[in-house]
A protein has these predicted regions:
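Short active-site oxyanion
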Residues: 42-43, 67, 98-100
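Conserved redox-active cysteine motifs that mediate thiol-disulfide chemistry
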Residues: 48-56
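Thiol-based oxidoreductase modules, predominantly thioredoxin-like and allied folds used
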Residues: 68-79, 88, 96
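N-terminal secretory signal peptides
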Residues: 1-12, 21-27
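Iron-sulfur (Fe-S) cluster-binding segments and ferredoxin-like electron-carrier domains
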Residues: 60-66
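Short low-complexity, flexible loop/linker segments enriched in glycine and/or proline
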Residues: 12, 80-87
């Protein structure tokens, strides 16, 4: 005959559930918020550990309402995994809203991308490191172009920046 005994692990299960709930609430309530009260969009930024301009770009993104999780990584495998063609690569790769952002793309272009959600593209890129792109900020200003790219490496012009933002 089996005696009625408390279920083993009940205390642990309740404790785990409570801690999970408290952790989730803290994470949600602790996130930076936009003026409308919505949580700031979060981006994952992969960067080479030795690159300083990448942090300047992260500062640009966070100053424009984004939350950034920065991961120092070997960039070759990251670019392969996210299908960034060699000709379109830059110093860091960012993931946000299902898109890949390659390099020093202005926050305003990312905002537009997330609003429009165009079909058939993987993301935006500024190949190389244009001197006047956010995070580089070399004076005098030098115009630069932001491109979309798809899985086959085809590009289209997304934005032309002819003056400082």
């Amino acid at each position: 005959m089996v005696q009625n005994q408390p279920l083993m692990g009940t205390h642990v299960d309740r404790r785990h559930a409570l801690l999970t709930l408290v952790g989730a609430a803290t994470a949600v309530l602790g996130l930076p918020r936009r003026a409308n009260g919505q949580p700031a969009p979060t981006m994952i930024v992969y960067k080479d550990p030795s690159c300083g301009c990448c942090q300047e770009w992260v500062n640009h993104a966070t100053a424009n309402g984004y939350r950034a999780m920065v991961i120092k990584a070997d960039m070759g495998p990251i670019k392969v995994k996210h299908q960034v063609p060699a000709s379109l690569q830059s110093c860091h790769t960012t993931l946000i809203g299902g898109f890949v952002i390659e390099g020093h793309v202005p926050a305003s272009d990312i905002k537009r991308l997330l609003k429009e959600k165009p079909k058939g593209i993987l993301g935006l890129t500024i190949p190389g490191m244009p001197a006047s792109a956010p995070g580089m900020d070399v004076k005098p200003f030098q115009p630069f172009t932001v491109l979309t790219f798809n899985a086959t490496g085809q590009t289209t012009v997304y934005a032309k920046h002819t003056k400082p933002a």
